[in-house]
From Swiss-Prot:
InterPro entries: E6, E6_sf. Signal peptide: none annotated. Belongs to the papillomaviridae E6 protein family. This is Protein E6. GO terms for biological process: DNA-templated transcription; regulation of DNA-templated transcription; symbiont-mediated perturbation of host apoptosis; symbiont-mediated perturbation of host ubiquitin-like protein modification; symbiont-mediated suppression of host innate immune response; symbiont-mediated suppression of host type I interferon-mediated signaling pathway. GO terms for molecular function: DNA binding; zinc ion binding. Plays a major role in the induction and maintenance of cellular transformation. E6 associates with host UBE3A/E6-AP ubiquitin-protein ligase and modulates its activity. Sequesters tumor suppressor TP53 in the host cytoplasm and modulates its activity by interacting with host EP300 that results in the reduction of TP53 acetylation and activation. In turn, apoptosis induced by DNA damage is inhibited. E6 also protects host keratinocytes from apoptosis by mediating the degradation of host BAK1. May also inhibit host immune response. GO terms for cellular component: host cell cytoplasm; host cell nucleus. It is found in: Host cytoplasm; Host nucleus. Keywords: Activator, DNA-binding, Early protein, Host cytoplasm, Host nucleus, Host-virus interaction, Inhibition of host innate immune response by virus, Metal-binding, Modulation of host cell apoptosis by virus, Transcription, Transcription regulation, Viral immunoevasion, Zinc, Zinc-finger. It comes from Human papillomavirus 42.
Amino acid sequence: MSGTSASSQPRTLYQLCKEFGLTLRNLQISCIWCKKHLTGAEVLAYHFKDLVVVWRKDFPYAACAFCLEFNSKICALRHYERSAFWYTVEKETGLLLEEQQIRCALCQKPLSQSEKNHHIDTGTRFQFILCQWTGRCTHCRGQCVERRLP
């Protein structure tokens, strides 16, 4: 993998597979934090979440599900700035919500329009973390509710 220059290194798992003649199914990639190989499901989830490949010493890394959520929580604790309703997010950015890529604060999946609409309809605030507006996807929002149930 050392044959690629920094400017031409693949940024997505799809590009990485294409460049090296692999498929997502047979891609073996390590977690940037724990160094374990991602499972097939984690590779597909990473691709689905449209996350970028991290390069260290000309070697590609991704993030396993546990480390991604764990580090997202740490990032939120360290870098949380404020929460705001949708109209404040639109006013501050100058863009409509549907024009913005807002990720889930836990799993980093880009929120769908229906997930953004849920924030609007329920009056749920978005969080400004590390200079990015974040929210909660349907899956992670469900996990929070499950923890509160008896």
